[in-house]
UniProtKB/Swiss-Prot annotation:
F(1)F(0) ATP synthase produces ATP from ADP in the presence of a proton or sodium gradient. F-type ATPases consist of two structural domains, F(1) containing the extramembraneous catalytic core and F(0) containing the membrane proton channel, linked together by a central stalk and a peripheral stalk. During catalysis, ATP synthesis in the catalytic domain of F(1) is coupled via a rotary mechanism of the central stalk subunits to proton translocation. Component of the F(0) channel, it forms part of the peripheral stalk, linking F(1) to F(0). The b'-subunit is a diverged and duplicated form of b found in plants and photosynthetic bacteria. Pfam families: ATP-synt_B (PF00430). It comes from Prochlorococcus marinus (strain AS9601). It is found in: Cellular thylakoid membrane. GO terms for cellular component: plasma membrane-derived thylakoid membrane; proton-transporting ATP synthase complex. The lineage of its organism: Bacteria, Bacillati, Cyanobacteriota, Cyanophyceae, Synechococcales. This is ATP synthase subunit b'.
Amino acid sequence: MLAFNFFGATEGGLFDINATLPLMAIQVVALTYILNSLFFKPVGNVVEKREKFVSNNIIEAKNKLSEVKKLEADLLTQLQSARTEAQRIVSEAENESDKLYKEALELANNEANASKEKARLEIESQTSAARDQLSKQADDLSELIVNRLILEK
């Protein structure tokens, strides 16, 4: 008792060493064991399951993201090839349209030239026929005049 008073501790204080100290130690160990088996292990298992679930979902999301990126790249490639094909088709259609236009224009010009030439030949023919007729009428008229003059004398 003198030793405890020497350090300033009184009986029944915080640092009393008696039979309650080992009992308290056993209670702490028992409480730790009970809490560990009844609370911490199930909570730890739930946390581990949740971590596995989250980890699996993250891995699955990464896989899906990589698949989406691959599909996006494929679709962009297909889109680019479709655009190129569309441009090629439009270009071919424009070329074909120009070709048909030029052919139609050439055909129309040829028909117009043929029609113009036919009209020119017809006009020349009619002009020649009119000259011949006029020449014949002039000959007939001059013969008539000559015959009248001869008959009058």
